[in-house]
Amino acid sequence: MSLDSLKSAVPDYAKDLKLNLGSVIGNSDLPAQQLWGTVLATAIASRSPIVLRELEPEAKANLSPEAYSAAKSAAAVMAMNNVFYRTRHLLSDHEYGTLRAGLRMNVIGNPGVDKVDFELWSFAVSAINGCGMCLDSHEQVLRKAGVDRETIQEAFKIAAVVEAVGVTLDAEAVLAAE
């Protein structure tokens, strides 16, 4: 189970995705923890069993136990936050924005890894889940911490490719079962 296995599973009509897997993940300039934490968090967020099954072992091999757990935590807490804050943002009644959230999200304050890495993973998950409010918030925290736009873009490129591969392979699995 690996990036190479996943690339091999991508159908010919989606050759661009196969090439992007190789360039965006296989040849990334991100430090290993940022790269593989982003890969794991976005694989979880993609909701694709195939993608998660193929990428998780390689991510686990490249992350410390703390980073592995933190990347999963980023995917979990952002699954909740992205729905909550996206809904609050999209409602035409802006009074919801003044109400207390009342949701526990302690892991954001104490993720067990470098907070910049956790923010990057949270940002990438937010890209998949489409929460503009969360994207802006995490991007601002990253920029204030000195993270350059190129690094931030790498995270959402990973998110885009992982999501697209998940959609494609899950569709192929359904079509093959017919």
From Swiss-Prot:
Positions of disulphide bridges: C131-C134
Domain of life assignment: Bacteria
EC category: oxidoreductase
Enzyme Commission identifier(s): 1.11.1.28
GO biological process, one term: response to oxidative stress
Any one GO molecular function term: hydroperoxide reductase activity
Catalyses which reaction(s): N(6)-[(R)-dihydrolipoyl]-L-lysyl-[lipoyl-carrier protein] + a hydroperoxide = N(6)-[(R)-lipoyl]-L-lysyl-[lipoyl-carrier protein] + an alcohol + H2O
InterPro entries xrefs: AhpD (IPR004674), AhpD-like (IPR029032), AhpD_core (IPR004675), CMD-like (IPR003779)
Keywords: Antioxidant, Disulfide bond, Oxidoreductase, Peroxidase, Redox-active center
Positions annotated as active site in the UniProt record: C131, C134
SUPFAM superfamilies reported for this sequence: AhpD-like (SSF69118)
UniProt xrefs under HAMAP family: AhpD (MF_01676)
Biological role stated in the UniProt entry: Antioxidant protein with alkyl hydroperoxidase activity. Required for the reduction of the AhpC active site cysteine residues and for the regeneration of the AhpC enzyme activity.
Quaternary structure, from the entry: Homotrimer.
NCBIfam families associated with the record: ahpD (TIGR00777), ahpD_dom (TIGR00778)
Family membership noted in the UniProt record: Belongs to the AhpD family.
Protein name: Alkyl hydroperoxide reductase AhpD
Protein's organism: Streptomyces coelicolor (strain ATCC BAA-471 / A3(2) / M145)
Lineage: Bacteria, Bacillati, Actinomycetota, Actinomycetes, Kitasatosporales
Gene name of this polypeptide: ahpD
